[in-house]
């Protein structure tokens, strides 16, 4: 039985053409996870929770499969290093330091949205202490933030680099990231704004990983910090006015996404330029050291 399962997994991973397993993997895992969640309804799982539980099952299966996938397809013996969850070199900053740096960038980006809201009297501070909200924010940070970064900047980006090349790979992962998170039930211009902001965020996160020497934790801090930070602000710390401008808080009506606002788009564009300048400078420094030695 185990030998049959192993053979089936190897067959899936090594399917040809080479791009086919990439497009087949997630639907197959989601179908398996959804099926397992459906079975739990027989023992009392609410039908409203099937999608969430199925997604959790699917991601756990994804993590279990990754070591085999990386060894067979990427020919790398250290899967968690390849995904960016463990450092490649001893002299690199700790994962906690890299995570903290990403969190600080998320705080700065959110501040660029919150300060104009307060100064323009489109929002005011409120405080409703809630342990449940803090726990939810923690889950968003280390649940959604970590899971999505493993999926997009850990696994998908590497696969797209292998299939399309480095330049097309980084653009493609950002495009897929934006499309997956877009809402298509809004007008054309709000949707384009949201797609643009999410695309820029995908590029920023990819370059963040490059600057962090392959570590994924800076991406987790930045991405998860934006999600959990905006959640706490919107649900707990800020009372938004009904006339708060969409160019500031983003499209979405009563459930806005600030990444689609002009302020976030401008800030992400600036951050992308800063990161790219820093990355080019680090490459130049490495080249000089190599030539000197």
Question: Residue locations for each model-derived region?
Answer:
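N-terminal membrane topogenic signal
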Residues: 1, 5-23
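Juxtamembrane helix-loop-helix connectors linking adjacent transmembrane helices
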Residues: 2-9, 36-53, 76-150, 157-158, ...
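Alpha-helical transmembrane segments in multi-pass membrane proteins
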Residues: 15-75, 96-102, 135-136, 256-266
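Aromatic-anchored segments of alpha-helical transmembrane domains
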Residues: 26-34, 110-116, 174-183, 224-236
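Functionally important transmembrane alpha-helices
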Residues: 35, 193-250
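Small-polar-interrupted transmembrane alpha-helices in polytopic inner-membrane proteins
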Residues: 110-113, 137, 141, 145, ...
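Membrane-interface helix/loop boundary segments of multi-pass membrane proteins
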Residues: 147-172, 207-215
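C-terminal membrane module of polytopic membrane proteins
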Residues: 224-293
